[in-house]
UniProtKB/Swiss-Prot annotation:
Family: Belongs to the bacterial ribosomal protein bL25 family. CTC subfamily.
The UniProt record lists the keyword RNA-binding: yes
GO MF annotation list: 5S rRNA binding; structural constituent of ribosome
A GO BP entry: translation
Native source species: Microcystis aeruginosa (strain NIES-843 / IAM M-2473)
Protein origin, superkingdom: Bacteria
One family name in Pfam for this protein: Ribosomal_L25p
Gene3D superfamilies: Ribosomal protein L25, beta domain (2.170.120.20), Ribosomal Protein L25, Chain P (2.40.240.10)
CDD domains found in the cross-reference section: Ribosomal_L25_TL5_CTC
Record flagged with keyword Transmembrane: no
Keywords attached to this entry: Ribonucleoprotein, Ribosomal protein, RNA-binding, rRNA-binding
Protein name: Large ribosomal subunit protein bL25
Function: This is one of the proteins that binds to the 5S RNA in the ribosome where it forms part of the central protuberance.
Length: 185
């Protein structure tokens, strides 16, 4: 899925609150030229649309800044929002090289219906995401785990996950991800 966002360089000496009142969300792009960072603004509608399509530290985003010669891909590194109003406050992007290795977090999704649940057991998920290493062009959105063969009293470990090609697991392979426990009567 191709996701992109249009940004502008942030005007100097303007309060972030004033920008938000104008419908602009302050943002920053890290790592586009070594250690240099650049202050940006994103339209609020564009930012909200972006966040519906992309997830933090998982989706590559084409960041376009017309005032800069740099164009490239970035990960959304951080999203700041008001704790209860849910208003968007700030976005942080981290520039990535298409062929450079990244350490990222990927969610785990169970597929299938476990044999143990058909026998009256309950499935418990202990780990919701795993740390992996891969190149930027090969980031999986989710890692699916087939639980259909698990019976009551059995479990699946992180080491049992089937990683997509080019993706390396960074977590302890002996950590339990799913287990089927007998239901209390």
């Amino acid at each position: 899925m191709q996701v992109s966002v249009e940004c502008q360089k942030r005007p100097e000496n303007i309060n972030p609150r004033a920008l938000r009142r104008q419908g602009l969300i302050p943002a920053v792009l890290y790592g586009h030229n070594g250690t240099e960072s650049i202050s940006l603004v994103v339209g609020e509608k564009a930012a909200l649309t972006l966040l519906k399509k992309a997830s933090v530290n998982n989706t590559l985003v084409d960041v376009n800044v017309p005032e800069m010669p740099w164009t490239g891909k970035a990960l959304i590194q951080e999203v700041q929002s008001h704790p209860w109003k849910r208003n968007l406050y700030h976005l942080s992007f981290f520039s990535v090289s298409a062929h450079g290795k990244l350490d990222i977090v990927v969610p785990i999704k169970a597929i299938g219906e476990a044999i143990g649940t058909k026998q009256g057991g309950l499935i418990e998920q202990f780990v919701n995401e795993v740390n992996v290493s891969c190149i930027a062009d090969n980031i999986p959105e989710v890692i699916e785990f087939d639980v259909s063969e698990i019976g009551v009293g059995q479990s699946l470990l992180v080491g049992d996950l089937k990683m997509p090609e080019g993706v390396t697991l960074k977590d302890d392979p002996h950590t339990t991800v799913f287990a089927i426990v007998a239901a209390k009567r």
